[in-house]
């Protein structure tokens, strides 16, 4: 089951019914958290306590296999200190999102060792193309090695010849900067 949470901004320009219909057309069962249907102060999907609790609840829910964020926006750095990371560490699941979700991706990696999926979000499911969906499935189902490729019409340019090894970590630069000097900051050593 795909659990959808809204740890940042509220839903805009689509409906939960449309999102559910589109995700089900890809074969997913869908469960929405409380925050998905909330709008708090016009720019948050619920108050900080609700959004933090929704994250914990989805990690605790044994029926949920994958957690995908509804959308980005603003607000994840407000809830980083409200999350019980032991819950997440003891119930690891793929966690997908980008933009403002970078704050959670960094915190989950730093505190729980969970490798985040910097990827598509549920509010955009109606705009997914075949390449996007195939990339999501490949990332979620890989066994040994994940092979990344660009769309055929997008050429890959090599900036520097050679090989590199390490952990690739990134996301929204403003969120990476916002976590610098905190316990959620990227360890860029490796």
Predicted feature locations:
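ATP/NTP phosphate-donor binding region
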Residues: 1-63
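Conserved active-site and cofactor/substrate-binding residues in soluble primary-metabolism enzymes
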Residues: 11-14, 18, 50-53, 74, ...
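Short active-site oxyanion
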Residues: 64-66, 90-95, 165-166
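N-terminal glycine-rich "phosphate-gripper" loop used for MgATP/nucleotide binding
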Residues: 66-77, 98
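Short, acidic/small-residue loops that bind anionic groups at enzyme active sites
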Residues: 85-108, 115-122
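Conserved anion/nucleotide-ligand pocket segment
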Residues: 113-181
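Internal helical hairpin/lid segments
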Residues: 187-190
């Amino acid at each position: 089951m795909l659990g959808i949470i809204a740890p940042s901004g509220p839903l805009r320009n689509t409906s939960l019914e449309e999102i559910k219909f589109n995700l089900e057309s890809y074969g997913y069962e869908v469960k929405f958290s409380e925050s998905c249907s909330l709008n708090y102060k016009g720019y948050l999907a619920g108050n900080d306590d609700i959004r933090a609790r929704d994250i914990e609840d989805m990690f605790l829910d044994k029926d949920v296999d994958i957690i995908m964020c509804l959308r980005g926006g603003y607000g994840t750095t407000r809830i980083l200190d409200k999350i019980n990371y032991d819950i997440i560490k003891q119930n690891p699941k793929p966690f997908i999102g980008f933009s403002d979700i970078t704050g959670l991706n960094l915190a989950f990696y730093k505190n729980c060792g969970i490798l985040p999926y910097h990827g598509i979000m549920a509010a955009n499911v109606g705009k997914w193309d075949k390449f996007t969906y195939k990339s999501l499935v490949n990332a979620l189902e890989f066994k040994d090695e994940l092979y990344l490729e660009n769309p055929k019409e997008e050429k890959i340019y090599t900036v520097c010849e050679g090989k590199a090894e390490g952990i690739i970590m990134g996301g929204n630069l403003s969120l990476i900067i916002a976590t610098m000097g905190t316990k959620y900051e990227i360890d860029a050593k490796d």
